[in-house]
Design a protein with these regions (language model features):
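Gly/Pro-rich, tryptophan- and cysteine-flecked surface segments typical
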Residues: 1-203
Length: 203
């Protein structure tokens, strides 16, 4: 982002009963000359926060679809927004993680900034799905308020030899609720197989 706080702001007007789809959102914002987007070239990855100027967001559903080219077309996954007040406050579990020659698991975290501007610090306990034994704890993961972080190939990086497992994400310091999720990708390494993803919500 080409702003001091790495944030771009824009408005959407939605009438009662209206559905609105914003395809290729970054390009759309660029065409609107939204401050912070800049010229085509850089890759954008991050988190979207939605608020209303008056009232509340009851009755409003927000979702996103992330797409990537592959094979003869494109692959993608869809996920819904997490409502204010519904994020995790102390820990979250992610089940069904995989790391094989055909699949890999990325894990992502969002510091919602709902409480204040403090940084959250996390640890991740990784368990073997075959034995139920904790294999390793990844500590000292820091994330500023209203920021997003993805850990690619979590099992390959931190628990080599674990082909299927699960993880507990814990907030060890900080005041803000957080969101944890995983994406199971087709292909043991980036660039292999289709790269198609399956979204895994936390429990």
């Amino acid at each position: 982002m080409e702003t001091s706080d790495d944030t771009a702001n824009f408005q959407v007007t939605l009438q009662a009963g209206e559905q609105k789809i914003l395809p290729k959102i970054v390009n759309a914002l660029r065409q609107q000359a939204v401050t912070g987007i800049g010229a085509a070239g850089p890759t954008f990855a991050g988190v979207l926060f939605a608020t209303v100027s008056t009232g509340d967001m009851s009755g409003i559903v927000i979702g996103a679809r992330t797409l990537a080219p592959g094979g003869w077309g494109q692959y993608g996954l869809f996920y819904n927004a997490v409502p204010y007040g519904s994020a995790s406050t102390s820990s979250a579990w992610l089940f069904g993680l995989q790391q094989t020659t055909e699949t890999r698991s990325n894990v992502a975290l969002v510091n919602t900034g709902e409480t204040d501007a403090s940084t959250d610090v996390f640890s991740i306990d990784i368990y073997s799905g075959g034995t139920g034994v904790k294999v390793v704890t990844v500590e000292g993961i820091t994330l500023g308020a209203r920021r997003w972080l993805q850990i690619n190939s979590l099992l390959a990086q931190h628990a080599p030899g674990v082909s299927q497992g699960y993880a507990q994400v814990k907030r060890t310091s900080g005041n803000n609720p957080f969101i944890a999720y995983a994406v199971i990708n087709d292909g043991g390494q980036p660039g292999e197989r289709s790269g198609d993803g399956a979204f895994v919500t936390s429990a």
